[in-house]
Structure formats: C-alpha cells, structure tokens
C-alpha cells in the first residue's frame, strides 16, 4: 500500500508543483474537530489469531508491514509473515495444511505464506524458508 500511495503522491505533487513554485497554491487547514487520535501500535498487536477469518489476517499482515509486522510463535520462536495471500485450504485454525506453509484460518479459508522472516534472521521467500524449517504439514501453530 505504501508503494501505491507514493505513486499517487508523486502524481499529485507534479500536478501542483507549478502553483507551489509560483505561490499560487491554495492550502486547506485540517478541521481539528474531525481529527482523531490513534494510539501507538504495540508489537503484541501483530500476533496472529488463527481463529480469525482470512480477510482479517491478511489485513493485519498488510497493515502492519513492515513494522511492527504480523507474526506467529511456534516452538518458542517468532516468525514474521511479510507477505501472504488468501487461499481455499480447509483445516483446524492454525494447522499447517501442506509443506509450503499454508495455514488454516477460522473461516474455512487459509493463508498461503509467500515471504517470512524468522526472528533474528533475514527475510526469505517461502521456498528458501521451508528448506531449513521444521514446520511441516500437520504442525499446529
């Protein structure tokens, strides 16, 4: 989403740069009566609840990327999901459905992880990650 917004912002700046340089631009103050406060996002908010529906989980993955990130804990290790997509796999929430890390959600759908980062390690695509991972089909997260 950040990438999409950066392109939109660049286009808007180019559309208005002449007005800005010639002091012809008009600026609108924020209406403070409509402003809201958003508290700082805490790391723990990134913990994935696999009983949630797939849409909410993928929203958390995308919304918290890159920092603090959406994550799960397995065997005492933290794994940050950097990218994923909704799939139609069915299983118990948190169950790994196959050997390329597709994880069941609470709504009879699943999240297929495509990029992941183990705590203290570099980000990896799922193929690289699975070569050295002990997480396999049937594992419960």
Model-derived features with residue positions:
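An anion-binding loop in the catalytic cleft
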Residues: 51-141
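Active-site-proximal loop/hinge segments within enzyme catalytic domains
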Residues: 1-87
């Amino acid at each position: 989403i950040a990438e999409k917004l950066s392109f939109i912002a660049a286009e808007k700046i180019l559309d208005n740069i002449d007005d800005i340089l010639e002091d012809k631009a008009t600026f609108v103050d924020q209406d403070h009566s409509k402003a809201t406060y958003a508290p700082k996002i805490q790391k723990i908010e990134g913990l994935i609840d696999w009983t949630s529906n797939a849409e909410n989980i993928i929203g958390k993955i995308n919304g918290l990327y890159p920092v603090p990130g959406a994550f799960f804990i397995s065997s005492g290790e933290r794994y940050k999901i950097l990218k994923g997509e909704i799939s139609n796999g069915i299983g118990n929430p948190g169950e790994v459905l196959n050997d390329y890390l597709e994880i069941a959600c609470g709504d009879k759908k699943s999240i297929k992880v495509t990029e992941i980062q183990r705590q203290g390690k570099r980000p990896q695509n799922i193929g690289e990650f699975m070569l050295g991972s002990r997480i396999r089909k049937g594992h419960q997260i």
